[in-house]
């Protein structure tokens, strides 16, 4: 026994320290136990981090979608204001349908009214165009912007919103005038709009404009929306779940029409306000002069 391992008792006897009872193998076991406990602690910490990540990441994703939705609303407010300023300058007449000449359409007419800021036409969810397409006119999708070609190389437009075609002050395309049975639905200026807070001017869409009709069903493909030329721009151009907590890239390509439509879009109305509208609610707006709000047709 080493001298420093012993102590004197009260009666002068020698007391042995506790270390005398621990042989080398016992010490190794004790050290191993301490190491094992440390590993268990580390595994518990890792598990807790995983649980916290599972709770926090969806919240962060939701917050990001919400931020994009707010920016979209701000964009549409600026577009709506630009449209109102144009009408004020042209004695209450809405934007003309201009695809001849330089093909400015509404984008070229309004550019000066929103400070020539091109990005105001782009919803943050859909800013990129389809670069794989070689067409001069490229359709958008739930998460991509459309592209409109002009004869002026400096005036190629892109955007994520459509203009309500029933508001155009003159409707003549390369094939001629709008058919008479449809022309009766046109708003003939500011004085003919009886429900300004429920009459859309702009909305999230896969194309530059639209002419919804009461009998229009939603698009079966909620990612690409409904296509169609001329004045045949159905409401399906707008039935894309771009907002409302929905991830636009995951929009169904083949939707069961018996189910409620998912998601929502932003709508700018004639009175200047912008609202988030569920897709199923789109038939409750006054898209044209003779519209009767009702349930969604299938």
What are the functions of these language-model segments?
Residues 1-39:
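N-terminal leader/signal peptides at the extreme start of proteins
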Residues 7, 34, 54, 143-146, ...:
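Intrinsic disorder/low-complexity segments
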Residues 20-22, 26, 63, 163, ...:
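Generic cytosolic/nucleocytoplasmic N-terminal low-complexity/intrinsically disordered segments
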Residues 30, 58, 98-101:
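Short helix-capping and inter-helix turn/linker motifs at the boundaries of alpha-helical repeat units
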Residues 34-74:
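Amphipathic alpha-helical segments typified by the pilin-like N-terminal helix
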Residues 70-298:
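Short, well-structured segments within or immediately adjacent to enzyme catalytic domains
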């Amino acid at each position: 026994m080493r001298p420093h391992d012993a102590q004197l008792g009260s009666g002068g006897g020698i007391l042995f320290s506790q270390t005398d009872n621990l042989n080398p193998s016992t010490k190794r076991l004790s050290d191993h136990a301490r190491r094992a406990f440390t590993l268990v602690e580390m595994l518990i910490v890792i598990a807790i981090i995983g649980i916290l990540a599972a709770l926090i990441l969806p919240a962060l994703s939701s917050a990001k979608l919400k931020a994009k939705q707010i920016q979209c609303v701000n964009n549409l407010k600026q577009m709506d204001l630009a449209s109102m300023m144009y009408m004020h300058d042209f004695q209450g007449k809405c934007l003309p349908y201009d695809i001849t000449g330089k093909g400015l359409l509404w984008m070229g007419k309004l550019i000066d009214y929103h400070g020539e800021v091109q990005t105001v036409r782009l919803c943050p969810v859909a800013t990129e165009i389809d670069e794989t397409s070689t067409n001069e006119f490229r359709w958008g999708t739930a998460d991509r912007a459309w592209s409109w070609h002009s004869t002026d190389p400096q005036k190629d437009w892109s955007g994520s919103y459509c203009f309500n075609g029933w508001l155009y002050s003159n409707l003549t395309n390369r094939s001629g005038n709008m058919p008479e049975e449809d022309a009766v639905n046109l708003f003939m200026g500011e004085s003919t709009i009886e429900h300004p807070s429920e009459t859309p001017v702009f909305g999230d869409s896969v194309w530059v404009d639209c002419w919804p009709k009461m009998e229009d069903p939603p698009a079966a493909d909620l990612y690409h929306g409904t296509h169609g030329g001329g004045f045949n721009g159905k409401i399906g151009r707008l039935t894309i779940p771009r907002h409302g907590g929905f991830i636009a890239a995951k929009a169904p390509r083949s939707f069961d029409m018996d189910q409620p439509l998912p998601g929502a879009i932003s709508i700018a109305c004639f009175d200047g306000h912008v609202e988030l509208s569920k897709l199923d609610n789109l038939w409750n707006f006054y898209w044209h002069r003779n519209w009767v709000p009702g349930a969604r047709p299938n």
